[in-house]
């Protein structure tokens, strides 16, 4: 039977929620990943160092006994951020600030209205070596939802990089050929995370034969040519600029199967297996370890994990749902098969 042993991966973009939801989902990530970069879009958002440290304590309390998993904490960038906050964050071990353009995604109402007013804050991030994580979509209602990432590149990303050229930027959960091209052409201070869904699915998987609410995420799934461009990027000559970030975003089944359903796909349960499928299909299984376990750590300036995990070429059936607080949670590929299984 085919096996693949890799350095334990890290999830560089993860939503863990809070309360009972946190307790339900944290063990899935802790089982596979050594570390994860934790998104700060709680209600209310994680905007201060005190907020982040308190949230980290709640995450640690939700982990299985004996778990070595380490959450890497971030702050939610708001219009009120200051250079002093950046210095405080650095001193407290916060790894990054996250940009949510106001209204772009789940719990983004506190997001930034004009990023260019925060240039002194971004300059301090560059000085302190704190990363700038970007949800790269414009929120202009006149821009089609399928074009919002591409529009963001010209309107925001390129001008910001021109003004703060040494800022370390992660273009999060990229979905388009344009975003991949920006990262490929930018300096080594610019990298990107890519989700399993944007490597495996296209917008037909969302809309053909009926609306598939469990395939609805933001940024929304794009056409097949974009999916192919992402696969080419993560397996190509400059693959070191791309790394694993699931954007696993749990929502109760009732909130997804809804007249106004929430955006987000829960993939943490079988994340590395889904990525293995991508790299296998691309004939690039030898590049999975760098994507999952090396590139992100290098970009964040942290050591690689010292232990390993082993994947076996053995099919598994994903559960139709799993418990989630008072409700249930539908994982990515619920009821379907994945060709790889982690040996636990």
From Swiss-Prot:
E.C. number(s) listed in UniProt: 3.5.2.3
Positions contributing to Zn(2+) 1 binding: 13, 15, 98, 247
Cofactor binding description: Binds 2 Zn(2+) ions per subunit.
Ligand binding (Zn(2+) 2): 98, 135, 173
Residues the entry annotates as binding substrate: 15-17, 41, 135, 218, 251, 263
An example Gene Ontology CC term for this record: cytoplasm
Active site: 247
The protein's required cofactors: Zn(2+)
PTM sites of type N6-carboxylysine: 98
Top-rank lineage group of the source organism: Bacteria
One of the GO BP terms on file: pyrimidine nucleotide biosynthetic process
Subunit composition and interactions: Homodimer.
Name assigned to this protein: Dihydroorotase
Species the sequence originates in: Neisseria meningitidis serogroup B (strain ATCC BAA-335 / MC58)
